[in-house]
Amino acid sequence: MKNRRTLTFEQARGPNARRRTCGRFFAAVLSAAVSSGILLAQGATPAAAQSAVELPVAFQVKNTNTSPASCSSGLADGATYTIRGHISGPPAALASGKAELVTIYLFGYEAGEWNWDLKGVPGYDYASEVAKKGQVSLTLDELGYGASGHPANGNETCEGAEADITHQIIQKLRHGEYTLPESPTIEFSNVVLAGHDVGGEVAEVEAYSYKDIDGLILVSFADQGFTPYITETETHAAFQTCTESASGYAHLISDEEFRTVPFYNTDPRVIEATAALRNTNPCGIIRSAPATLVPDHALAPQIKVPVLIVFGENDQLVTSRQGQEEEEGVFSGSPDKKTVFIRDAGHFVMFSRTAEVFTRP
């Protein structure tokens, strides 16, 4: 097996990476999003600290792909699976059978639900922290990851299928058609969809395919400007690592790369905690990601809801700064869009030491 060169963060970024400071923090971005319509004011209580609860939740879904983003390595198997996660929020917001707003958080390669609710290192459980500020979140393990169902072969799903499954979950959230073991289900009037890394691409596909969300947030994802590093990495994983995987599940990068390349200004405890939780990826997702860019560019202009785009200012791992700055233009049909660069943060924006800004009023 030919070994692919392992790069440090600085090598992956390249010598021409530029530094740009933006003083607007992520929590301030969310506040701005409230006023611009991405997050509805009725669904968020002002910043006074509140208590938070986390409720285990399960959704029954079918692994189908009715989106325009085709599966590249085989068809979705059409089977029924359980998607598991948690709804987090202030007790008052979850006390009745109806609530105003929930934000669904999707993740990218190598990750899992922990991307948005990391336990064990204080201050990095994003869902819990924003719950204390009045926001309701759904974090989950997507199909093929963590505690959720896994197709027998990881080639039997793809980004389009993950978007379809997300659409199913959104409809179930709106109608209370899911399982909360210890309490009645809640019907949510408004749903915002957020995604990190290729979870952002899945969120984008969901948005233009089904047009059933009230706002879209992309974190560390752009549809253009891909670096030589990520092009080589994706190609190697799709055509070599996945080809050699009998199960159809594979890591995108090595353990050494995971511990160095996507992190910037990060507490070593966070790196160790996330490395211990790292998941393999369904190869159908790895193989479908590049091809999904075609419908992205063709159909993203159909997205009419507000769009918030977030990057770490020190993240040029996957896309160039030019590609990041051009992302707003992909959403020409949205009447309200904004791009924000987070100071001293890398690809895993939520795990940089500036993560405290996520919950700052």
Language model: regions and residue ranges:
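Alpha/beta-hydrolase active-site loop
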Residues: 156-185
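Conserved alpha/beta-hydrolase "acid-adjacent" motif
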Residues: 316-325
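Accessory cap/linker subdomain of secreted extracellular hydrolases
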Residues: 219-299
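Catalytic histidine-centered segment of alpha/beta-hydrolase-like enzymes
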Residues: 345-355
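Short, surface-exposed "cap/lid" segments of acyl-processing enzymes
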Residues: 94-135
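Alpha/beta-hydrolase fold nucleophile elbow
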Residues: 181-197
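N-terminal cap/lid segment of alpha/beta-hydrolase-fold proteins
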Residues: 50-98
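Short beta-strand/loop motif that positions the catalytic acidic residue
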Residues: 303, 309-311, 315
